[in-house]
Design a protein with these regions (language model features):
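Conserved alpha/beta-hydrolase "acid-adjacent" motif
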Residues: 78-87
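Short beta-strand/loop motif that positions the catalytic acidic residue
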Residues: 65, 71-73, 77
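C-terminal catalytic histidine-bearing segment of alpha/beta-hydrolase fold enzymes
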Residues: 86-146
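A conserved short beta-strand
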Residues: 12-25
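Acidic beta-to-alpha connecting loop that harbors the catalytic carboxylate
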Residues: 75-78, 106-108
Length: 146
């Protein structure tokens, strides 16, 4: 990992910055509303190290250089609390970062497109209300890059 950080330092940050972020049911915070399993996998033996946790807690790093954000989540996600998305939206708003957020009333985590093609275990994961997020994202991208 130290080699990767050195390579990044030699890059032009503006050249490697994404033009936009599109996130679905994202893990944002390492705080009390965190999805602990994500941080255990990400940080391994350092998953209890507060400095490391703060370094990967996204809401702490949103600033004016953050690219525009499109995000969606379901209110009933029982894996990653919807508050993660709300924290992201709040941080973007405070930093003046354009953000479009869609909260759908039902659906669990891992819905993908919410269609029969992406459903898992039979009908689990078919959520008609969620099926509109790709259309919304496409419209957002068209506005953003028009």
């Amino acid at each position: 990992s130290s080699a990767a950080s050195d390579v990044y330092k030699r890059q032009d940050p503006d050249a490697v910055r994404p033009n936009a972020l599109m996130l679905g049911y994202p893990v944002i915070t390492s705080g009390p509303l965190a999805h602990r399993g994500s941080f255990d996998c990400l940080l391994g033996d350092n998953s209890d190290n507060q400095v490391a946790l703060d370094a990967v807690s996204i809401e702490r790093h949103i600033d004016a250089k953050t690219p525009p954000v499109f995000v969606w989540h379901t209110i009933t996600d029982d894996c990653v609390p919807v508050e993660n998305t709300l924290m992201l939206v709040d941080a973007c708003k405070k930093a003046g970062v354009p953000v479009e957020a869609h909260l759908f009333p039902q659906g669990g985590h891992g819905l993908a497109l919410g269609t029969a093609e992406t459903a898992w275990q039979g009908v689990n994961g078919i959520e008609p209300c969620v099926q509109q997020w790709p259309v919304l994202a496409n419209a957002w991208l068209r506005r953003l890059f028009a």
